[in-house]
Regions:
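Positively charged N-terminal leader segments that act as targeting/secretion signals
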Residues: 29-31, 59-60, 65
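Long, contiguous internal "core" modules enriched in hydrophobic/ aromatic residues
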Residues: 62-412
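Short basic-hydrophobic amphipathic alpha-helical segments used for membrane targeting/insertion
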Residues: 22-29, 33
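Extreme N-terminal basic, low-complexity initiation segments
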Residues: 2-23
């Protein structure tokens, strides 16, 4: 271990001193085998003793076992029925809506929306308007536009949420690269220095991933790579690095950090030594455990938005930690999402994520109009109940949001 800490920054995981690397890998493998066996035993016992409906609540991605999203529901008994529902075209689906009591003024228009959006995607939007969930009959007076309005609201909520996620993600990338490049060992190539990580396993996984990303760019000869760039002759940064430099074999961190996906960025932050995680969090006026939790939530919400999933009236499965420190901007009443508070709001829906995004925007974009746009969106759709997002009716009166509105009114 002392030899490992004293060795110079390796260019590859294979450049580590051989006996030391083997010892570390053997120990890591042994730990992994013990953990895998233990989780396998626990998973088998869980499957044998727990009704399938409860597995979604008892298994988590971190456990290494089965994971089902909170939207998943399953019968306690093993399924025995054969699925025999026929596929219907949009005109038949319009007739089904009419049979269930939905008012449709223009059938051709409704059929067009079903053709280009899909009956299945619209189905969750019909649930609040159903008087009977068994036969899916609608509350008298419900129109097709009522359902479409929910879908449009959710789509606009996607766009607004994605806007804030983009700003926060870019800020985290910049903070990680800046802090690690100037305050840690290794300079621009800090990610190759084992001492910057919690352990060898985290270090090894990160370096291997970056080497893999770089190797993808080396698959083409330099002349071929140049042909792959756009016609304006602005080659991407990785292509430029590979065509210009022979060493180090991987590019500097400010380039590498842009190659990572949001999920890889979140894992990289979690793998860093704690003192660096704290420094990066301070850059955003957050605490280390709060930022680590929020990043996990952002990856989940980002993936939902990227795949056009539903944000409205949905349990996310992963939710952000509620900050306890007074240094982190949050709602005036910090017990709003406290599970010990009988009047607390649901933590597993979108609202805590929205609050966390605005909390970070106070630092990275102090005069952003994002909060005002959120308020305008909800006012634009008054028939959308705020509790579907886990929001109270008077949510905008909180001093937290009032400060955001005031800052936005000054200038962007």
């Amino acid at each position: 271990r002392l030899q490992q800490r004293e060795c110079s920054c390796p260019q590859s995981t294979h450049d580590l001193p051989e006996p030391n690397r083997n010892e570390l890998e053997i120990r890591a493998s042994a730990r992994s085998s013990r953990v895998t066996a233990r989780h396998l035993t626990q998973s088998c016992r869980l499957l044998l003793t727990t009704p399938p409906r409860l597995l979604a609540h008892q298994s988590t991605p971190k456990s290494g076992g089965f994971y089902l999203s909170t939207d998943y529901t399953c019968r306690a008994n093993s399924p025995t029925r054969h699925y025999s529902k026929p596929a219907l075209n949009e005109n038949d689906l319009v007739k089904r809506y009419l049979e269930r009591g939905l008012t449709i003024a223009d059938r051709d228009r409704a059929a067009r929306y079903l053709r280009h959006i899909g009956y299945y995607r619209l189905s969750p939007c019909t649930i609040p308007f159903q008087v009977d969930r068994t036969n899916h009959s609608f509350t008298p007076g419900t129109t097709f536009d009522d359902i479409l309005n929910v879908y449009v609201f959710d789509r606009e909520l996607h766009l607004l949420t994605t806007d804030a996620l983009e700003r926060v993600e870019v800020a985290v990338r910049a903070a990680t690269s800046n802090i690690m490049s100037t305050h840690s060992g290794g300079g621009a190539f800090w990610y190759r220095d084992y001492s910057n990580y919690q352990n060898y396993k985290d270090y090894s996984a990160t370096v291997k991933r970056i080497e893999h990303l770089t190797s993808l760019g080396r698959q083409y000869a330099p002349s071929t790579r140049r042909e792959q760039t756009d016609r304006l002759h602005y080659p991407d940064a990785l292509t430029h690095y590979l065509d210009t430099y022979t060493s180090p074999t991987t590019p500097p961190s400010w380039l590498v950090i842009e190659l990572l996906t949001a999920g890889e960025l979140q894992r990289l932050y979690a793998d860093l030594a704690r003192k660096y995680r704290k420094a990066i969090a301070r850059e955003l006026h957050l605490t280390e455990p709060v930022l680590q939790s929020w990043l996990k939530s952002y990856v989940r919400v980002r993936n939902i938005c990227a795949h056009h999933g539903r944000l409205w009236n949905r349990f996310l499965g992963v939710y952000p930690a509620i900050p306890k420190s007074g240094t982190v901007r949050w709602l005036s009443d910090r017990s709003t999402f406290d599970t010990s508070n009988p009047e607390a709001l649901e933590r597993k829906r979108l609202y805590p994520v929205l609050v966390s995004l605005q909390s970070t925007l106070f630092t990275i974009s102090p005069h952003s109009s994002w909060a005002l746009r959120l308020q305008n969106l909800l006012e634009k759709h008054p028939r959308i109940p705020p509790n579907a997002l886990s929001m109270r009716k008077g949510w905008a009166a909180d001093r937290f949001w009032q400060d955001a509105f005031k800052a936005a009114s000054q200038h962007e």
